[in-house]
Amino acid sequence: MKKATIITVAFLLLAAATIFFANRKRGEWIEEKRFQMATVTKIVIPRTKNSGTIIQEAFAAIDEVERAASRFIPESEINSLNDGQWHKLSPVLLPMWEKARELYELSGGRFDPTAGKLISLWGFGPEGIKKEPTAEEIEEALRLTGLDKVETSNDFIRLPKGMRLDLNSLAAGYAADRAAAVLKKHGLTKFLVDAGGEIVCASPGKKIWDIGIKDPESENETSVISLYNGAVSTSGSYANFYKSGSNSVTHIVDARTGKAAKTSLLSVSVVARDGIAADGLSTMLFCLPPEEGKKFPANAMFIEEVGGKLKTTKTGEWENLEKWRAKQDSNLRPTD
């Protein structure tokens, strides 16, 4: 799992601040879970005569993203792209590729979707061999890393033979978006989709979703934010790492150097209009030097360890979201 867990999801009535899940009427909502994308996914919708069928269709949309983008499924679309030939990207994979290219440019190349070989080399790919690579191994993998080496033409793409795409930093958020699109298609205006901590939610009127963000050093919440409509994602070095001697090796790799990211950051959380933006931005901001990331125009919370103590920095509208002053999309200024 790429993500730090986002916990304590509750539906609140703003005026009374009543925790809906603690006091909900029996049978008013349906909540189902699945194991998908190597994590637990959850969908919460109002109970109707068609809710069972609708929720299954939404889970199927998540399956579709996994079949397209998972490097852990040998026959997935993304694994078919490494033969050096031209391929037409499917309507499922194409939006992820386009968002990844955008984040590559915004990050100055630190966020690079072509870093699949590096990610595997450091032990976080399908091979699962967790060891620090040699300088020679890193140099070899870097020769097959770099979005500037990829050829594109409209919806077609050609990678150098042996290059590996990795869109894991976008896939869960995008899967939540696809599931949410199914729910909206069926006329639902109140719902929550949780794809392993990548949350997309919607609610009309004064009812809001209350979402707690996990403290990197405990099981408590370090922040609780409120949303009418939008998405939230957290990337963290503490959620997926291994020890190599005295070093902690994180799953987030700097594609420019080929080395696992070394940073004071423990987590970055982002609120955006949709899941793919929140998911990708939380990873991109984690890849940037902390002071550079904090200047980026996003609704974000950075938690880092400085001098043995935790330091929290909130940007954009984060503090307003914490104070229950959730705003409609037109006022929230979400990052696309």
Q: Residue ranges of each PLM-predicted region?
A:
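Mature catalytic core of soluble alpha/beta enzymes
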Residues: K2-D329, D336
